[in-house]
Amino acid sequence: TNALAKEKFANVDSLQEALNTGFSRLHYLFPDWEIPAKVYLFVSGFNSSVIYYENIIGVGTDMYLGSDYPYYNQVVYDYQKQTMRKECIVGDIMSMYLSYHIAYNSKYNRLLEQMIFRGKQMFLLRQLLPDEPEWEIIGYSQEQWNWCELYERAIWNRIMEKKDLFKTESLVLSSYMNDGPFTAEVTQDSPGRLGQWVGWRIVNSYMRNNKEV
């Protein structure tokens, strides 16, 4: 594992360039936020992908060896391997950093509120990483992203039919918002975390129609 990690991360120029772009844009939007002083690569023993401590970011390179890395079959589920690629590192770092600075706070903790919160994060990530494909930002494959776009109306019909938007039950929230092989509340053909995708669509629609924001 150590040897493979060193090989795959021997050249990190593109990673560094993308991070510089992301944090430069972040500093422009939030000048009071402290930009991380260092980003370290390390082998985590398959325990950590991205960590943030005392203004230092650590990236567990053994968590990004590629979705086809054979050993992953022994330690993670198939659906988790999609995000265990080098291409996902920048999005994971920026997402973790935003979560550290922008806490979720809701009086009722309804599904719609969680959707919109995550949608705002995704929208902001898109502004910070304009060159990243949208599916990479949310951690989908391009095929999963295309499925969501193709069946967007059916997704909404299902959500409204079940009256899920204002539910607060933990099982419902978990099904829509947490990682999994699919979003059980919608269909087994869907990708997981479909609530995050829906939230992003809501925020995108709002921002398109309210350009003064």
Question: Which residues does each predicted region cover?
Answer:
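Acidic/His/Gly-enriched intrinsically disordered linker/tail segments
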Residues: M122-T183
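Acidic/His-rich structured neighborhood in mature extracellular/periplasmic domains
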Residues: N2-W145, V213
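Residue-level preference for alpha-helix termini and adjacent loops
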Residues: K8, G58, D62-M63, R158, ...
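Non-transmembrane alpha-helical segments in soluble domains
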Residues: H27, L125, W156, M160, ...
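C-terminal soluble interaction/assembly domains
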Residues: F166-V213
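Short, charged low-complexity intrinsically disordered segments located at boundaries
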Residues: I51-V59, R153-I159, V186-R193
